[in-house]
Amino acid sequence: MALKSPAFRKKFPLLVTGSLLALQPLATSFVVAAEQYDCSVSASGGWACAPKTSAAQLPPRPVHDANSVSSSVATAADATGEEASGDKSKLVTEAKGRGLKSRSADYSHLDWVPREKLTAAQLAETGPYCSGSYIEPIRPGMNDKTNKSDAPTFIGAKASRYQQEEQVATLAGDVVMRQGSMQVEADEASLYQAENRGELSGNVRVRDNGALLVGDHADIQLDTGEAKVDNAEYVLHKSRVRGNALYAKRAENAIIRLKDGTYTTCEPNSNAWQLKGNNITLNPATGFGTATNVTLRVKDIPVLYTPYIYFPIDDRRQSGFLPPSFSTGSDTGFMLVTPYYFNLAPNYDATLYPRYMAKRGLLMEGEFRYLTKSSEGQFGAAYLNDDDTDRKKQTDYEKTRYMLNWQHKGGLDSRLMTEVDYTKISDPYYFQDLQTDQIGVKATDYVNQQGVVTYRGDDYTARLNVQAYELASVANITPYNKLPQITFNGALPYHPQGLDFTYETELVRFDRDLLTGNYTDKDGGPIDPVTGAVGTRRLDTNVAGLARANGDRLNLKPGVSLPLNWSYGYLTPSLKYMYTQYNLDLDGTGKEGIVAARNYATATGTRYVGGDYSRNQNRGVPIASLDGGLYFDRNTQWFGKNYRQTLEPRAFYLYVPEEDQKDIPVFDTGEPTFNYASLFRDNRFSGSDRVGDENKLSLGVTSRWIEDNGFQRQRISVGQALYFKDRTVQLPGIDYRTRADATSNVSPYALEYEYRYNRDWRATADYNWDPDSHSARSGSAMFHYQPEDNPNKVVNAGYRYRNDQIRYDQNSGTWKMGGDYGTPGQPGYVKDYYKIQQHDFSVIWPIVPQWNAISRWQYDYNRNRTLEAFGGFEYDNCCWKLRLISRYWVKYDEFSQNAPENEKGDRGIFLQIVLKGLGGVMGTKVESFLDKGIQGYREREDQAF
């Protein structure tokens, strides 16, 4: 039955009893009434009942089972006897953290649905190791958002009786009361009009907004919806949270309070872990809970106590402590992190990370995040008064350690964009000694200090960039800063005769302050036995000649091209002109270095390949190219499957005249390693300080196998360049006559290959073969397997080889080819230090249900050493996860300026325990090296629930 409630909600009991009188005949044959009544809502909001003028023929009585309510003495006595003779309902405390099986063997009383009975949509939302899920049954009003004071009330039962003098309504048999989204179910109910309350007994269920309370007996306040359920169990469906309590109270605002209660995300038949507290409060409105005098129990055994805990019950944000983590390490000793989250507003928040380290003290770190309609970003800071003294004798070490960070992206409008990436650290050893929890802060050799303003027009882009770097290493030379850099690039909006006109403009100031003096290591040395000098020269003192210059650079690069496109191919002639003007400053040390290098070359009879200093330098170089390709395709079959196979030959001719550039310093230029894409670049250098002279014809061909649905099964590209002159323009210090690849008539053969067996696994390879030396110049082969429908399986295998690096040598201050560190015969020299010849294998694979093997092995064949190896296992179920991994790795910790001396092997055994619903208890570092070391690990975790 359904009646619209009067506007005043406190008349709810009268509404119930009146509805019973008005709409339901008396239930039992032994109830005798002298009069029948017609009842309706009065003008005052109460009920007006009047005797019927005539006793009409009543409809037949419904037949009810033995559970129907009765007032006969005999029936009541029989019922009492049956109850006394039957088994009493078990207490929830007897279940020891599991669901109460006496209520239902399959835990259906908790809305538990086994995995085999879940629908496809429900399975997609259920973790792979969960044997089922809590599914709230569909019921009328479950999504009703109407205020309860305005919502109609529904009452149903198999039998009912009303005692008018006592103003008590008694319901029996499948009792259901519903108002708005709240629904109460029981075997029997007594509603007391005078006291505005009800008593329910037998299989009591209280449902509201995705929460379920189950108990043996309940008291409910009819005018507010407050309820107390004895011997209670509860479920929060979406959060997969359940528990029990001596009794549970539901407040009018739907907050649930538990006396001597438990909290867990484990399945009903599991007591793997639970929180047990004297008083537990769950607030579905905020998504968080609190508990006092709490013990964390594993298999009902207490393992941890806390007087207070604040924990999430869903994924919403709320201020409070986050799960703590603790670990041990040689640099920190015992470490405990107790993060606290501040939910300040919907669009900004903050997190404080107090990090106690037994060897170093208390590191206070925090971050503030913000989000507006036009911007997003974060501020971060960290501070430590370091108690550790291992580095106190090292140069640049600071006892007061700190880090500041600001990251920002925003737009003043749709065209004007701003970006900031600024990090400052107290000393170059900060990231080697200390961890950071700030999002986006990367531990590299340099920290970025950059601010950018970009304006995007219809046909152009203007950009102002101010960028500096701070060293986070003592084994590198101080880099150049751009203070500032202004670029203006675009294309003309008109295209006469199909011509495209483009332009690139840059004005930038390069500046750096090179460090002077000596560097002392962790022992305060070394001490020269002859001179008594302490320490070694800083690496910055190795920078000599033009490499010490600062200056301004103006670069202009207009271009014109004529793209011609047809269905069968394309042809694009292009002409560019690159003009660069320099205004340089060189200190006395740099000028003296140029003179000394010239004198040394003269004395030894060698060729001087360095440059001469002139304050004003300029260079103008035309760049002409002709790029063309054809497109052929055909329908074919491969292993019985239809494909469209393409054949795409390409020819690229490039002519750039030789221009002497040795008097120009290198500010931001390098030479990328050779690959297939190198064949079709118009400058073999990156940056603007060098324009490579070229007279070459590059030939390449690509073939693809494409399925009818557009899926590219396979792609292969192969090509080679034919050179018609030597490449004389080189980076400073390199003589083209000593480079075999600069005087060769042909480039290496370049090959790229990709094969996808399906969307689950793929293989990629690249290979560069030098026909002059009949040897591989570089190459790699990678295999990756991870099924879309089961990302828990991950296999990676790869091999890399490279020995054609062009790099800046920190020890000599010059550009060099090859992989050697330092100079032969000099201290610290290591042959083939930078040469790459490695294999990398990693796997995550299920062994048996819920058990996975995890392993990685990265080996360096060049130096016959293992770079990293770890192996272990993972146990994962619906409510907790454990990983135990043994790991060996090469650790880099700077106690010297010579990079090879800072490498040493380290070992560790890592344990990670994750209680789902509470977070990681220990072992957060495990996440870090698994994420970095195993491709596909992050995708696996994101999809594994």
Swiss-Prot record:
Residues 1-33 form the signal peptide. It is found in: Cell outer membrane. Residues 56-98 are annotated as: Disordered. GO terms for biological process: Gram-negative-bacterium-type cell outer membrane assembly; lipopolysaccharide transport. Its main location: membrane. It comes from the Bacteria. Residues 65-79 have a biased composition (Low complexity). Component of the lipopolysaccharide transport and assembly complex. Interacts with LptE and LptA. Belongs to the LptD family. It comes from Pseudomonas fluorescens (strain ATCC BAA-477 / NRRL B-23932 / Pf-5). Residues 85-98 have a biased composition (Basic and acidic residues). This is LPS-assembly protein LptD. GO terms for cellular component: cell outer membrane; transporter complex.
